Amino acid sequence: MALAGHCECGGIRFSVDESALLGTGYCHCSICRRLSGAPVNAWVAVDPAALAVAGAPALYRSSERGQRAFCPTCGSQLWYAPDDGSFLTLNATGFDDPEAPALRPQVHIFDADRLGWFEIADSLPRSPDGSLPGG
């Protein structure tokens, strides 16, 4: 099943088949917090080869490990791409149906960076860094 999404202004659209999803979760790192403007960022990791994009996103090198894509018109953050090209993490809230069961977060990463005043009361696995628990 195809999962589609877009930036706020609609200038950039994307889609990916559900079979290309590699994982979902919440990121508590300071970069995701600043760029999303929220205390946590919900992400969906996908195989980069499976992502179809219409429109031309702008790129921003957010760390020594990778870059972010965003809409040059409305500024919506679209995805993070590590330099090794092994995956992309799309913002879960950018999908047309962010409540689709396949997009439900399954893990917390960078939990050691979580803001002390913010807590999500769930039983999902938590990783203190960017590694996936059990991975």
Map each language-model feature to its residues.
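A short Gly-Trp-Pro
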Residues: 1-135
